[in-house]
């Protein structure tokens, strides 16, 4: 049990690090260049269309990260987008925000460059 708790802390620290060390962090299935699910591809493509620099974390490479990010955010699905440490949401929310212009506003108000 003690080792499991320690492992959970290591996973939490790794997730924390990804979020804190990158202004925009996307926990996704696959990579930005080779997404492994349609939802991850959608969010990755939106970020690319906005020309936002982002860190893609492939949850398929680590089952504990895949499970841990869901607990970390209290959100049941992947992908998950974080901007400046704030959890934004999954595919549906990001897509709606993109279509309404709210996502671009969120980036600019957070000091993140986007395509004009």
Go through the PLM ranges and name each one.
Residues 71-77:
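Thiol/disulfide oxidoreductase modules built on the thioredoxin-like
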Residues 11-13, 66:
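Eukaryotic intrinsically disordered and solvent-exposed regulatory patches
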Residues 1-6:
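Short, Lys/Arg-enriched N-terminal segments with co-localized hydrophobic residues
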Residues 48-66:
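Thiol-based oxidoreductase modules, predominantly thioredoxin-like and allied folds used
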Residues 16-53:
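Local sequence-structure signature of Cys/Sec-based thiol-disulfide redox active-site neighborhoods
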Residues 27, 80-84:
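Acidic beta-strand-to-loop metal/phosphate-binding motif
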Residues 83-115:
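Non-catalytic, surface beta->alpha helical segment in thiol-disulfide oxidoreductase systems
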